């Protein structure tokens, strides 16, 4: 739905030339010939594109690219900086299939690097126990043939329960802080989103991806983190130096966190995480 509405129908609406990428990775090699002015990508493909652009230079885009619109997962701030250095704006948004694409988005002239942007016209957002609820004419009418699941997701007065946790700042910018299904219950009874702890790590240019989870040390429940390095940042470094860097990074971030939120176990991955077709890390399969 994200690709159909934001890319395909959006291009038709403004009368733009549209290129369909049936094989996204193969299409990247054709960018110099296509010369796009805008790309609509999930963050995982943004990561790949950034790596290729670093290898071949900004001309890899074809010389005309001005904007990348990304959704479906949080966009690491370091990726935004990579593209900004090449003169390309990476704009993040938020939405879901049930709301027919994006509900919030950053604009060229009104953006915040850690945010999914402001609410689009004709839509409403409210927070119920920190869960994001969405209402508008774009909201679906229900799951076909599944009234039970529809009743769980869609309220009688038209609000979609997103299952996502978030907040909005005083300027109207929205932030995604986690998923209800990912909540961990700490020994003190507190609910904690792993995404809340992962966020500071994603601000480091050395972290490509990470996962926080519950673990144990000698039978004691602790928080653990797995980190996938952004290896181009460690060119010429040994693996011991890479792991030492992340041990120090964990110490530095732990110093900013409440004691109950601190990471006690660290592992650094040489292999990628298992991912979905949209390049999202599969949290419960790694």
Annotated model-derived regions:
Residues 1:
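Conserved AMP-binding
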Residues 12-14, 19-129, 218-220, 231, ...:
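Conserved adenylate-forming
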Residues 39-42, 125, 172, 201, ...:
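Residue-level signal for inorganic ion chemistry
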Residues 95-99, 162, 187, 276-278:
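Ser/Thr-glycine-rich phosphate-binding loops at phosphate-binding pockets of nucleotides
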Residues 119-122, 126, 131-186, 191:
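Conserved ATP-binding/catalytic segment of the ANL
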Residues 139, 173-202, 231-241, 257-263, ...:
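Adenylate-forming
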Residues 165, 204-230:
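C-terminal boundary motif of the adenylate-forming
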Residues 184, 209-214, 249-286:
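Conserved C-terminal "lid"/linker of ANL adenylate-forming enzymes
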């Amino acid at each position: 739905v994200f690709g159909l509405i934001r890319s395909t129908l959006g291009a038709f609406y403004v009368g733009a030339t549209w290129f369909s990428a049936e094989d996204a990775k193969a299409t990247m090699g054709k960018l110099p010939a296509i010369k796009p002015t805008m790309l609509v990508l999930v963050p995982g493909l943004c990561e790949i594109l950034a790596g290729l652009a670093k290898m071949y230079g900004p001309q890899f885009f074809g010389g005309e690219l001005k904007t990348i619109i990304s959704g479906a997962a949080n966009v690491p701030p370091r990726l935004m900086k990579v593209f900004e250095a090449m003169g390309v704006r990476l704009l993040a948004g938020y939405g879901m299939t049930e709301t027919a694409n994006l509900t919030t988005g950053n604009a060229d002239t009104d953006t915040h690097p850690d945010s999914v942007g402001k609410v689009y016209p004709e839509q409403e957002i409210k927070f119920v126990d920190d869960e994001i609820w969405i209402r508008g004419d774009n909201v679906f009418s229900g799951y076909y043939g599944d009234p039970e699941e529809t009743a769980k997701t869609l309220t009688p007065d038209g609000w979609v329960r997103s299952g996502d946790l978030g907040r909005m700042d005083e300027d109207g910018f929205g932030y995604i802080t986690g998923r209800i299904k990912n909540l961990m219950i700490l020994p003190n009874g507190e609910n904690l989103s792993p995404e809340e702890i992962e966020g500071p790590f994603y601000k480091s240019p050395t972290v490509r991806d990470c996962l926080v989870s519950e673990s144990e040390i000698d039978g004691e429940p602790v928080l653990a983190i797995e980190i996938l390095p952004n290896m181009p940042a460690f060119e010429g470094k040994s693996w011991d130096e890479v792991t030492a860097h992340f041990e120090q990074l964990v110490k530095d971030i732990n110093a900013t966190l409440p004691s109950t939120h601190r990471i006690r176990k660290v592992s650094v991955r040489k292999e990628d995480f298992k991912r979905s077709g949209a390049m999202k890390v599969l949290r419960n399969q790694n």
